[in-house]
């Protein structure tokens, strides 16, 4: 007997767009000499004493086993000829904005998951195109023609399957999963490829002898709930291609922040205040992008000895004004006890967010 009823809405048309090695691809586009070479977005460990992590890398670098979140030192050891680029996140944000404008030509129901991926519900799209595959192809064409980058697309009747489909054929692939093909598609997938199933859950499933979607499909719902609690209910439905989570065009954000880690420690107050200013301006720009205002400003400081201090101030009025955010964050820093150790990391975050109110004029 099912603990929770099975409800499967197969009427929707969902596209998941995932840019191919986005940051590295932007760098290759802007510097064609990089094409065909292993490119890593991250600090060069030869210049940082081995510190730093890989933000992302291109497909050439991935051939050496390099991946996101790997230490830059290990990436260099795996591929000494890799080209390390610190990255230009303002440039990437600008390109991401271009791509989102392309999405909006087809539908307003867009849920960005990050700067380089998004879900689109094109069931009722602006152009009246019935085929989601056709829309996905048009988006791929528009992005290539106007932005000079490739993306992979997954098309299906829910977000879970669309995400798996976009990962299935990269780079520049397009995969369609119809409702009649979903079980076959899922059956062949390794369980670690299932979106939303983390490393610890994968290890636990392996301990149970579950390695593929086919294996998962054979497990009774109650057994999964006994082992995983409520998540067992989700696993049971994932194995059957069931997910009714809507594409949310306005994802709820609890905070917006910006922080930087410094290869060279900061000691001088002028340098520290300059970095606080940069972070404050970045936060203000992000608030503007997301049409949000905030009340609570948080400053995070990490010293050379890895001591981390976090302090917040709540304002009487909502704001997204860069100068005000900078002033308050600077005042917070001034209120901290002196620490002779250099600063390794600075971050500014705005919380207590609310949607922009039309009659409040608090722009940059």
UniProtKB/Swiss-Prot annotation:
PROSITE patterns: UMUC
Residues at which Mg(2+) binds: 18, 116
Annotated cofactor note: Binds 2 magnesium ions per subunit.
Enzyme kind, highest EC tier: transferase
Compartments in which it is found: Cytoplasm
Record site: Substrate discrimination: 23
Main location: cytoplasm
Catalysed reactions listed for this entry: DNA(n) + a 2'-deoxyribonucleoside 5'-triphosphate = DNA(n+1) + diphosphate
Alphabetized Gene3D superfamilies for the sequence: 3.30.70.270, 3.40.1170.60, 5' to 3' exonuclease, C-terminal subdomain, DNA polymerase, Y-family, little finger domain
Domain UmuC: 14-198
EC number(s) per entry: 2.7.7.7
Pfam families hit by this protein: IMS, IMS_C, IMS_HHH
Source organism superkingdom: Bacteria
GO molecular function, a single term: magnesium ion binding
InterPro entries in alphabetical order: DNA/RNA_pol_sf (IPR043502), DNA_pol_Y-fam_lit_finger_sf (IPR036775), DNA_pol_Y-fam_little_finger (IPR017961), DNA_polymerase-Y (IPR050116), DNApol_IV (IPR022880), PolY_HhH_motif (IPR024728), Rev_trsase/Diguanyl_cyclase (IPR043128), UmuC (IPR001126)
GO biological process assignments: DNA-templated DNA replication; error-prone translesion synthesis; SOS response
Family matches, as NCBIfam families: PRK02406.1, PRK14133.1
Assembly notes: Monomer.
Designated name of the protein: DNA polymerase IV
């Amino acid at each position: 007997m099912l603990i929770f009823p099975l409800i499967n809405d197969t009427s929707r048309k969902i596209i998941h767009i995932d840019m191919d090695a986005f940051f590295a691809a932007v760098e290759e586009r802007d510097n064609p000499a990089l094409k065909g070479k292993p490119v890593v977005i991250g600090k060069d460990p030869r210049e940082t004493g081995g510190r730093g992590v890989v933000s992302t890398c291109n497909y050439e670098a991935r051939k050496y086993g390099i991946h996101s979140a790997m230490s830059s030192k290990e990436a260099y050891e795996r591929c000494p000829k890799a080209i390390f680029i610190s990255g230009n996140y303002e440039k990437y944000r600008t390109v991401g904005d271009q791509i989102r404008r392309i999405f909006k030509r087809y539908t307003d129901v867009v849920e960005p998951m990050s700067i380089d991926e998004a879900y689109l519900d094109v069931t009722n799209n602006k152009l009246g195109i019935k085929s989601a595959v056709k829309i996905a192809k048009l988006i791929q064409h528009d992005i290539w023609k106007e932005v000079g980058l490739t993306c992979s697309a997954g098309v299906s009747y829910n977000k879970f399957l669309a995400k798996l489909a976009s990962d299935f054929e990269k780079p520049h692939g397009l995969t369609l999963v119809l409702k009649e093909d979903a079980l076959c598609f899922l059956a062949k997938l390794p369980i670690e490829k299932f979106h939303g199933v983390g490393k610890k859950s994968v290890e636990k499933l392996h301990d149970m002898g579950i390695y593929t979607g086919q294996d998962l499909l054979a497990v009774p719902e109650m057994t999964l709930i006994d082992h995983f609690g409520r998540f067992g209910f989700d696993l049971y439905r994932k194995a059957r291609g069931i997910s009714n989570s809507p594409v949310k065009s306005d994802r709820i954000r609890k905070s917006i922040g910006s922080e930087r880690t410094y290869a060279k420690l900061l000691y001088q107050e002028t340098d520290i205040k300059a970095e606080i200013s940069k972070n404050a301006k970045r936060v203000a720009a992000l608030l503007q992008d997301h049409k949000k205002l905030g009340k609570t400003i948080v400053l995070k400081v990490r010293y050379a000895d890895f001591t981390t201090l976090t302090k917040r101030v709540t304002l009487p009025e909502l704001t997204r004004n860069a100068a005000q955010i900078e002033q308050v964050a600077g005042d917070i820093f001034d209120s901290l006890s002196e620490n002779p150790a250099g600063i390794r990391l600075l971050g500014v975050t705005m919380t207590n967010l609310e949607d922009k109110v039309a009659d409040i004029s608090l722009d940059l």
